[in-house]
């Protein structure tokens, strides 16, 4: 996941990105030391179980949309019926400005606590800071592909769902009991996103949705040289190249497939002087980029925040593939093992899943959709939240399920393969 539209960083040069990757430890090679700091009993060297099942860096089975995983409880959840803790501070650990501060203030006032917001640069660095003891938050943003390490390292606490009735009441069944956390032992869902293509209709002449393979547009973008960009995310970028060639397993650890995807991506430097970055929510609406790989929420946020006055909403367009061919994902929230307010932490998770709170966070602040039963594309268009031409940016529960395509945890070897491939792509443009 990425930052709130008003806070995300600008385009990175390939050299800058490589430096950042080295500094923040994107590669999982450091996972062993991370987990060792959390639990001396945790081993991460083994990549297969005694039955031959693939294991993630945390030593737990790899979850997939068609392979449900129930995570082990490393301690019992808190008892039911306890009163919430009051007074002092309550710390939320998250991406910068990814949660509406007004809502945090209202929660604090309701329960008599001072809510503090501590930010991390990315989820990898956030988990490392938590493991080292550098921060001691109550709750934190979590992603399904990092859940393996957080649970194995005993960094997050098991949940007592008696305190979180909004999970079953308001949330899509597909995410109220997700495949990556069967029984919702450690997480509740927060926001959703899909990966597709955003473009300016007043500059890009092709009918992208009608193309036999819409991803081909990047390899046909000579006319948009210097105005074309991909996400600066290893998994997203390589997955796009895989999908373009019809390879639907975006969690593959086949070196031949990864190497071919990287070779294909390198072609884009000569074709369209491809850029990498995460400001498509701004650059496409403002017209400084005409063609971009993008998350679904980007164009909604861009329409709200960055479309210049007088520019019609129809200048923006977004495409995503059909289910099973479009990468979809969700962010989560978890309770940190460091919390001194476990009851209040449960109530905070329930608060995030309140219909009014989640909707306000979406339409008044970050532009990323929560998985609420009550949200439908038609209603958002009718209410003027989303223009009709961007209605396909809104996800439905039908986009998720066993036949969906989601970037999930890889083995440590697989993660290194993807990271090395992406570094090769970045270096391939001449540095």
Show which residues each predicted segment covers.
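Mature extracytoplasmic/periplasmic domains
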Residues: 331, 335-403
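Early extracytoplasmic/lumenal segment of secretory-pathway proteins
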Residues: 66-149
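Short beta-strand->loop
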Residues: 157-167, 187, 309-327, 336-338
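Bacterial lipoprotein signal-peptidase II cleavage site
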Residues: 39-46
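Conserved C-terminal helix/tail region of periplasmic/extracytoplasmic solute-binding proteins
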Residues: 397-431
